[in-house]
């Protein structure tokens, strides 16, 4: 990279010489920096420069020169680097995408209103179903709208593909079969964190992933690097708490006061609001009342909000006009004493005056608009009614509390539809005994049967020819509803290719091949109960979809003979169907009813927990099928099959069978996170079993121990077939795709008997024959990583280091082995023990667990008792290794129970925390005011709810070389403080004990920022 030094960059060049010629470099330097403004003066002054500089005291002139000079140099270098793109990287440097126009910071309401306006267009109807019909609050609407916005922007300019994949993870989401209807699209967006007015905003990358019905099948899906907001210090947490509390209180105020709150927050100028933004006299008086409440309010959070917003601590009352002016309210015709009375009354009543008087809280949940809204605020009513059809939006107005009529979809399908006009069904004619002539009776009786349905004229009472007075009230005849003639049901034609469910799978799919003919018995037996059961799967929830998918479900009384229906959909009363053998009949696609319940048919009917996803249903079905004999297909569906076993993982990778060629397809295409798929190793999904304690002596990647063998102690002395071939452990997968395995000369001996090994070790077999694997090293993926508790870092035997008898020991720390030349070239990180946890390059095979520590070094025990909350959980530490030097400063927390079953660690990128997580919500961080349900940044506010509170973990240092450095880690004075802070009786607080927390309202304005 070139050094950015021009002519004037050396410190020796005189102060006012322009370092670069503006014409040659093309820089246009608007700010020449300190120094005489005329560049023409420089030639004249150069010879006398040294003399004039000598007249000043030397240090002062050097200081001035350096200050001004270096500023200018830095500015010039910065600009030059930015122009040539050197700050980022030299080749194909793309400047970050910026919006083409200036963007005003969004107000949440504006975005929401824009969403309401947008969904008037017909092609955005789906968006309106998603956003408006679900009655969400503004925050959720914003999430949806931002996602849609990203999607649109991403269509406009293609996806941002980072070449090296720096900080990005992406999967290729391919659907293996043409007909799988679900595709994924993502959109990314560079935006700023929502800091008001963009002071101190961070640039972050947002990503939305959309599933689309018939998307293109191969698309890169990116998910951005995770951005976590920086942890807030105690003052910020206090501020967040106050702001959240005020927002919570505002939600409980009447709408007119909420509006004034919003105006003050938007404008920040009371005078401007008073003069320009209040429309009716009632609005003006509301403002006066609000100011009265604020002037007497003693809630610290509201006080803080008010003074922070208006920008000073002594509010001025805008109705007090200067003496030479006619005050504004007088011009509006409001008397002075009215204003004074309203103000005093509000001062006396305080905050309770603003609260709603028993009206429902109308924040997008209540569908009713309360009377006080419409009655009190005439101005808003005029605004809203200016256009009756569409919701009207005024920038100063909160959106209507009532759902606009245009968005009401339709009444739910369960109730019969109420028509607004009278019909014979809704308004049956009152039956009164009116005398009519016999002739009209006969005419009526003759004409009735031909009428297709009862109409209002024909439904007049039909009386018997000889009425008896007793029977008169009872002989009112209703015409019986016409019985539908049983129509023979034709087998429905093969359906169109239109896909309906979220993940509906048809019989020609590769994902799951269900052959209707092969399972006639089970399908025909288990089908009848289906229409009478509540649907258990989430795919068939909407009535509309069922009505479309199924032929009309006919109750047994209505149908004709049972054989009339298609073979799989007979009524429950039907006997066993006579089915032609599958070879004889033409292969038709399953009729829609079968398709509707196709996957559900094989599920156990237990009322246990419902399967959440397709793979889970698939897994539980296969498991129950394995447990039944093939003969048990004939058992009736009323008898429930085995419930889903609790150990079935929620996502399991099953090899699926292709319809034509019955060979298993690797299902790693089907789910991007299936456990067998070789995802990049930072993404390796892990499952945890919540009850087993975190057993840190075990290697995190041991999935399940193959065959019960002797527990893991001295691996080195065992015969070769079971030795974990030490040459293997240092090899972190990500660096090189394992070509090195074949060439390694040193570790030949342990490999000896690999082909003869018993079955439990099956994944390793054929090791020498493996060709160097392809890019994602598919062939390698099932090998359980070396089954040894991390043996430290072992040099390969060729280096001649003896390895001692217990597994945690890695040889003495000789300076020779630490030297970067001598350590093994693939050793993932440096050789020296570190205090606390280092974060090495993440290699799932070799986590760097600090060795165990026994209490042998003198003052060990009281150091253990220093953590009272630890003692209660784990009991006295059971120490497994006898003579390992202490390496970690928080050693006692590593004492772990004896290895039981290997657990599957939590999916996280970071090494396990050095102390058990403590939810400091319980410990209590000093908050002002109530705990607010709508509080943002809850984790920040709770002092980082999931940060380990390890106070005396020092920053990682290199160990001292004296032998005493292997005793317990030296604790600085921080440990003494930590002991006070963590002792039983004291609550954990972030401040030292004597510092009193200052109140914001007492502090000056500059401190607030």
From Swiss-Prot:
The keyword Transmembrane helix does not apply. It is found in: Host nucleus; Host nucleus matrix. Residues 381-391 have a biased composition (Acidic residues). Residues 1-70, 356-504, 516-646, 663-922, 948-971, 984-1009 are annotated as: Disordered. GO terms for cellular component: host cell nuclear matrix. Pfam families: EBV-NA3. GO terms for biological process: symbiont-mediated perturbation of host apoptosis; symbiont-mediated perturbation of host cell cycle G1/S transition checkpoint; viral latency. Signal peptide: none annotated. Keywords: G1/S host cell cycle checkpoint dysregulation by virus, Host nucleus, Host-virus interaction, Modulation of host cell apoptosis by virus, Modulation of host cell cycle by virus, Repeat, Transcription, Transcription regulation, Viral latency, Viral latency initiation and maintenance. Its main location: host cell. It comes from the Viruses. Residues 710-769, 776-798, 876-898 have a biased composition (Low complexity). It comes from Epstein-Barr virus (strain GD1). Residues 479-495, 563-574, 899-916 have a biased composition (Pro residues). InterPro entries: EBNA-3/4/6. Residues 12-31, 680-689 have a biased composition (Basic and acidic residues). This is Epstein-Barr nuclear antigen 6. Belongs to the herpesviridae EBNA-6 family. Interacts with host CTPB1; this interaction leads to gene repression, but also seems to interfere with the repressive function of CtBP pre-bound to DNA, leading to EBNA6 mediated up-regulation of many host genes. Interacts with host MYC; this interaction enhances MYC stability. Interacts (via N-terminus) with host RBPJ. Interacts (via N-terminus) with host histone H2AX; this interaction facilitates H2AX proteasomal degradation. Interacts with host TP73; this interaction inhibits TP73-mediated apoptotic pathway. Plays an essential role for the activation and immortalization of human B-cells. Represses transcription of viral promoters TP1 and Cp through interaction with host RBPJ, and inhibits EBNA2-mediated activation of these promoters. Targets host chromatin through interactions with host transcription factors, especially RBPJ and IRF4. Alternatively, EBNA6 also regulates the transcription of the EBV oncogene LMP1 in a cell cycle-dependent manner. Residues 445-461, 622-641, 664-679, 862-874 have a biased composition (Polar residues).
């Amino acid at each position: 990279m070139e050094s950015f030094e021009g002519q004037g960059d050396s410190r020796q060049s005189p102060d006012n010489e322009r370092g670069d010629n503006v014409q040659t470099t093309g820089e246009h330097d608007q700010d020449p920096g300190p120094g005489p403004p005329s560049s023409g003066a420089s030639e004249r002054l150069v010879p006398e420069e040294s003399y004039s500089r000598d007249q000043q005291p030397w240090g002062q002139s050097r200081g001035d020169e350096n200050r001004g000079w270096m500023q200018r140099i830095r500015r010039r270098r910065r600009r030059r680097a930015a122009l040539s793109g050197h700050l980022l990287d030299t080749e194909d440097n793309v400047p970050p995408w910026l919006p083409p126009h200036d963007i005003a910071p969004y107000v949440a309401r504006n975005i929401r209103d824009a969403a309401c306006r947008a969904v008037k267009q017909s092609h955005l109807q789906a968006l309106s179903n998603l956003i408006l019909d679900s009655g969400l609050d503004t925050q959720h609407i914003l999430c949806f709208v931002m996602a849609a916005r990203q999607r649109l922007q991403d269509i406009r300019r293609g996806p941002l593909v980072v070449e090296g994949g720096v900080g990005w993870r992406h999967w290729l989401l391919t659907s293996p079969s043409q007909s799988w209807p679900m595709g994924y699209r993502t959109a990314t967006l560079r935006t700023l964190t929502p800091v008001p007015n963009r002071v101190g905003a961070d640039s972050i990358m947002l990503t939305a992933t959309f599933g689309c019905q018939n998307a293109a099948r191969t698309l890169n899906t990116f998910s951005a690097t995770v951005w976590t907001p920086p942890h807030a210090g105690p003052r910020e947490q206090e501020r967040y708490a106050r702001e959240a509390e005020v927002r919570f209180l505002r939600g409980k105020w009447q709408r007119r006061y909420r509006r004034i709150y919003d105006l003050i927050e938007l404008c920040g100028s009371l005078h401007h609001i008073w003069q320009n933004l209040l429309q009716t006299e009632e609005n003006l008086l509301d403002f006066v009342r609000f100011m009265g409440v604020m002037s007497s309010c003693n809630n610290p959070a509201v006080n803080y909000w008010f003074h922070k917003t208006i920008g000073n601590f002594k509010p001025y009352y805008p109705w007090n006009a200067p003496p030479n002016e006619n005050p504004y309210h007088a011009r509006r015709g409001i008397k002075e004493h009215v204003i004074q009375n309203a103000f005093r009354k509000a001062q006396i009543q305080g905050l309770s005056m603003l609260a709603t008087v028993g009206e429902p809280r109308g924040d997008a949940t209540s569908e009713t608009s309360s009377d006080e809204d419409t009655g009190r605020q005439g101005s808003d009513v005029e605004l809203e009614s200016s256009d009756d059809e569409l919701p009207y939006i005024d920038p100063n107005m909160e959106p209507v509390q009532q759902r606009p009529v245009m968005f009401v979809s339709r009444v739910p399908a369960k109730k019969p539809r109420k028509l607004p006009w009278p019909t014979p069904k809704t308004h049956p004619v009152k039956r009164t005994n009116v005398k009519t002539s016999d002739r009209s009776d006969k005419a009526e009786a003759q004409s009735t049967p031909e009428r297709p349905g009862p109409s209002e004229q024909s439904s007049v009472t039909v009386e018997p020819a000889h009425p008896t007075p007793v029977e008169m009230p009872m002989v009112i005849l209703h015409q019986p509803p016409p019985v539908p003639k049983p129509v023979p049901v034709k087998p429905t034609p093969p359906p169109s290719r239109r896909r309906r469910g979220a993940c509906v799978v048809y019989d020609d799919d590769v994902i799951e091949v269900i052959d209707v003919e092969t399972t006639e018995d089970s399908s025909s037996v288990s089908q009848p109960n289906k229409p009478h059961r509540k649907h258990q799967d989430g795919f068939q929830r909407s009535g509309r979809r069922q009505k479309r998918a199924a032929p009309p479900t006919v109750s047994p009384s209505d149908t004709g003979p049972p054989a009339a229906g298609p073979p799989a959909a007979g009524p429950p009363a039907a006997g066993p169907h006579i089915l032609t053998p599958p070879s004889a009949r033409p292969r038709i696609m399953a009729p829609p009813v079968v398709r509707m319940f196709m996957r559900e048919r094989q599920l156990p009917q237990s009322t246990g927990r419902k399967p959440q996803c397709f793979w889970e249903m698939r897994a539980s079905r296969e498991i129950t099928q394995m447990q039944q004999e093939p003969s048990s297909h004939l058992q009736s569906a009323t008898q429930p099959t085995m419930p889903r076993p609790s150990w079935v993982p929620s996502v399991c990778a099953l090899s699926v069978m292709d319809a034509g060629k019955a060979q298993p397809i690797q299902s790693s295409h089907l789910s991007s996170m299936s456990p067998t798929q070789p995802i990049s190793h930072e993404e390796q999904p892990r499952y945890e079993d919540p009850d087993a304690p975190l057993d840190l002596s075990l290697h995190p990647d041991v999935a399940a121990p193959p065959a019960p063998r002797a527990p893991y102690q001295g691996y080195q002395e065992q015969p070769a077939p079971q030795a974990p071939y030490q040459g293997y452990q240092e090899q972190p997968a990500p660096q090189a795709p394992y070509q090195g395995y074949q060439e390694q000369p040193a570790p030949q001996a342990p490999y000896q008997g690999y082909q003869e090994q018993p079955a439990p070790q099956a994944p390793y077999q054929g090791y020498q024959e493996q060709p160097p694997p392809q890019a994602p090293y598919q062939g390698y993926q099932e090998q359980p990583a070396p089954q040894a508790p991390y043996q430290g870092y072992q040099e390969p035997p060729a280096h001649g280091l003896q390895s001692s008898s217990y597994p945690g020991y890695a040889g003495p720390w000789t300076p020779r082995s630490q030297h970067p030349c001598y350590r093994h070239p693939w050793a993932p990180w440096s050789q020296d023990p570190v205090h606390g946890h280092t974060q090495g390059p993440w290699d799932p095979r070799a986590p760097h667990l600090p060795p165990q520590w026994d209490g042998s070094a003198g003052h060990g025990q009281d150091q253990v008792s220093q953590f009272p909350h630890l003692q209660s959980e784990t009991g006295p530490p059971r120490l497994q290794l006898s003579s390992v030097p202490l390496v970690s400063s928080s050693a006692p927390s590593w004492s772990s129970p004896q290895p039981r079953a290997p657990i599957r660690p939590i999916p996280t990128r970071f090494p396990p925390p050095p102390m058990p997580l403590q939810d400091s919500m319980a410990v209590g961080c000093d908050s002002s005011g109530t705990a607010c349900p709508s509080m943002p940044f809850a984790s920040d506010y709770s002092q980082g709810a999931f940060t380990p509170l390890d106070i005396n973990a020092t920053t990682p240092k290199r160990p001292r070389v004296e032998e005493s450095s292997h005793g317990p880690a030296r604790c600085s004075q921080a440990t003494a403080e930590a002991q006070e802070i963590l002792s039983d009786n004291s609550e954990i607080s972030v401040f030292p004990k004597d510092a009193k927390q200052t109140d914001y309202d007492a502090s000056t304005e500059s401190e607030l920022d």
